């Protein structure tokens, strides 16, 4: 795997040479738009809204719409004037307790791998973050854009987690979330806790697969093999129902989970003492 860039982690006077690698991969299927008559791929053209004419690249400029229909044009020199220092450095500004950071701030992880001569300092930072349960909050430039990021210890590696800036998150106060008067009823709360307990498992991420993509890929293969035909009708979507009697629904859920996949094995019956022959 090729690194995205090579640079360094910087905090205080310490500089650790590292290489940045992606920690995720995209499994999304890609589709092309086609003309239905002959399946010819459809291309896009740059067309002006005013007259519908195609616009060549040399006549295109970037503009910011500050009012409806009003634009200010920005040239390449304008972007360069406000460009942040595009050094390939993970510049740690602060260290914070990891459990203080709302997980909603985390966006996308990358691996940081020590480069030549960086192993001792890399290991030191990794162990410090592990023992203190802290993360380094940094700024880093990736592909010409500056990001907020957290440097975290993950297993044997250091992970650079790209974060959202505070203004990018929607405040929950902007949402109209209804709350039941008096809170949840005690009986329903106890039953819900029992249901959660019955459904609790040890975290095993490999158990959770992308069933939609798998089914879609299987259908694509079927269409290829059958010349474009598919068998069977599409499943009917489930209709959402308004829950009126929560207690009854919870009890039914408890009955199903208790007798279903989580059913405990029956205990072996104890043998009684054998009687002596008369």
Swiss-Prot record:
Record bears the keyword Cell division: no
Organism superkingdom: Bacteria
InterPro entries noted in UniProt: Ku70/Ku80_beta-barrel_dom (IPR006164), Prok_Ku (IPR009187), SPOC-like_C_dom_sf (IPR016194)
Limits of the Ku domain: 9-172
SUPFAM superfamilies xrefs: SPOC domain-like
UniProt-recorded Gene Ontology molecular function terms: double-stranded DNA binding
Region (Disordered) residue spans: 255-278
GO BP, one annotated term: DNA recombination
Keywords linked to the UniProt accession: DNA damage, DNA recombination, DNA repair, DNA-binding
Keyword DNA damage listed: yes
Basic residues bias spans: 261-278
Similarity comment text for this entry: Belongs to the prokaryotic Ku family.
Role this protein plays: With LigD forms a non-homologous end joining (NHEJ) DNA repair enzyme, which repairs dsDNA breaks with reduced fidelity. Binds linear dsDNA with 5'- and 3'- overhangs but not closed circular dsDNA nor ssDNA. Recruits and stimulates the ligase activity of LigD.
Subunit structure and binding partners: Homodimer. Interacts with LigD.
Protein name listed in UniProt: Non-homologous end joining protein Ku
């Amino acid at each position: 795997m090729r690194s995205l860039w090579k640079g360094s982690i910087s905090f205080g006077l310490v500089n650790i040479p590292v290489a940045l690698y992606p920690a995720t991969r995209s499994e999304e299927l890609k589709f092309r738009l086609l003309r239905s008559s002959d399946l010819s791929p459809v291309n896009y053209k740059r067309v002006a809204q005013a007259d519908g004419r195609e616009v060549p690249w040399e006549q295109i400029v970037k503009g910011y719409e500050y009012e409806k229909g009003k634009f200010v044009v920005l040239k390449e020199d304008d972007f360069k004037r406000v460009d942040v220092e595009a050094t390939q450095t993970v510049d740690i500004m602060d260290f914070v307790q990891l459990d203080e950071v709302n997980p909603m701030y985390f966006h996308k992880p990358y691996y940081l791998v020590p480069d030549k001569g960086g192993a001792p300092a890399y290991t030191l930072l990794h162990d410090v973050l592990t023992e203190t349960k802290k993360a380094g909050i940094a700024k880093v430039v990736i592909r010409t854009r500056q990001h907020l990021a957290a440097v975290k210890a993950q297993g044997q590696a250091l992970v650079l987690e790209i974060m959202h800036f505070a203004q990018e998150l929607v405040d929950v106060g902007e949402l109209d979330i209804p709350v039941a008067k008096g809170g949840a009823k005690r009986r329903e709360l106890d039953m819900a806790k029992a249901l959660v307990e019955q459904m609790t498992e040890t975290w095993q991420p490999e158990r959770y697969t992308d069933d939609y993509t798998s089914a879609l890929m299987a259908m694509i293969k079927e269409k290829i093999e059958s010349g474009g035909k598919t068998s069977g009708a599409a499943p009917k979507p489930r209709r959402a129902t308004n829950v009126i009697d929560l207690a009854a629904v919870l009890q039914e859920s408890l009955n199903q989970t208790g007798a279903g996949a989580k059913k405990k094995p029956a205990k072996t019956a104890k043998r009684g003492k054998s009687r002596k022959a008369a």
